[in-house]
Amino acid sequence: MKIYEIDGNKYRLPNELTDFQLQMYIHLINWKWAHLTQESGFFKNSPYDALLPDELKLQGYPLYRPIKERFLEHQQRFPFKSHKFLGHMASSQAACANLFLPLLEDPLVAAKVLVAVKTDLKSIATDHLDRGFRIEFWD
């Protein structure tokens, strides 16, 4: 763990970060401090500001509040493990769920948005999987 002092704030972060990672961590931690808590989480008994404290992790953070129940329903229907670091502000699993679950609630809107990435997309096969999507594949 390394303490970075930036703009008068002290950030407890991993020892080695690229410039991009450092910028992203600072952004995510500043958001966490402004909207959730200034309390750190711990990894191997060391405090890290990008980790959420256990109390918030148990409440399902950093999942976006309006999709938390949808995430849990999806996880029951298609069993998958929550990542070990789901309680990290830079969690890829949380980012994916926070981005795609709200979008995929409406397959027509989702198709219109996703066609920008997959130009030959016509529609989403809503009769398959969970309205045509699945967050994780473990089978």
Task: Locate predicted features.
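Nuclease-adjacent, charged terminal/linker segments that flank catalytic cores
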Residues: 1-138
